[in-house]
Design a protein with these regions (language model features):
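NTP-dependent small-molecule kinase module
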Residues: 100, 125-170
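Conserved lysine of the Walker
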Residues: 13
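A glycine- and Lys/Arg-enriched "phosphate-lid" helix/loop adjacent to the NTP-binding pocket
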Residues: 42, 89-132
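Hydrophobic anchor at the beta1->P-loop junction of P-loop NTPases
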Residues: 5
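Post-Walker A alpha-helix
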Residues: 16-17
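P-loop (Walker A) phosphate-binding loop of NTP-binding proteins
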Residues: 8, 20
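Short, well-ordered beta-strand core segments
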Residues: 69, 84-86, 131
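ATP-dependent small-molecule kinase phosphotransfer cores
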Residues: 25-79, 160-170
């Protein structure tokens, strides 16, 4: 099963992927993989981020071989995978995390708003009928992993969305 592990930058994707690796998942860091495959096509100086050609990267996704693979990154839901895990986080906690990492104020605000209005969830829902959304705000990384792993993706017929609504934060 090839699973996109996605969410707004700062929600805990890298931390969760480390837990998943301890539980037998192979992890693909999408940003590093894109660079290795020559799919970084530029730099967005305003966002201080690499621009990744996800269409080109999509052609490099390996066929499903039955192993458990997590493609970790905020663009992973744009890849042709089998399912998606979407991590959500209280936007105020997200803003604290991003500020502590030195993100510019405008970028913190942009990601705060993106999380509050479900941008990545909506994009992922458009691509994945097998999707699980969980709120990581009050969960330890191990508990968050369990909340995702306890859902049988193979038999999932419709998205499994834990209730999350932060629109009142805008």
């Amino acid at each position: 099963m090839r699973v996109a592990l996605t969410g707004t930058p700062g929600v805990g994707k890298t931390t969760l992927s480390a837990v998943a690796a301890r539980h037998g998942w192979r992890i693909v860091d999408v940003k590093a993989w894109a660079a290795k495959e020559g799919c970084v096509v530029g730099r967005d100086e305003a966002d201080e981020a690499d621009v990744i050609d996800t269409k080109r990267l999509s052609r490099k996704v390996a066929p499903d071989d039955g192993s458990k693979i997590l493609y970790e990154g905020h663009l992973s839901h744009e890849l042709p995978l089998d399912a998606a895990w979407v991590i959500r986080l209280d936007p105020e906690e997200l803003a604290r995390r991003l500020a502590s990492r030195g993100y510019p104020t405008a970028k913190v605000r942009e990601n705060f708003e993106a999380e509050a209005i479900d941008i990545i969830l909506q994009e992922a829902l458009a691509r994945f009928p097998r999707l699980v959304q969980r709120d990581g705000t009050r969960r330890s990384p191990e508990a968050l992993y369990k909340a995702f792993a306890d859902v049988g993706l193979e038999s999932l017929k419709a998205p499994d969305l834990e209730p999350v609504d932060w629109t009142d934060r805008l």
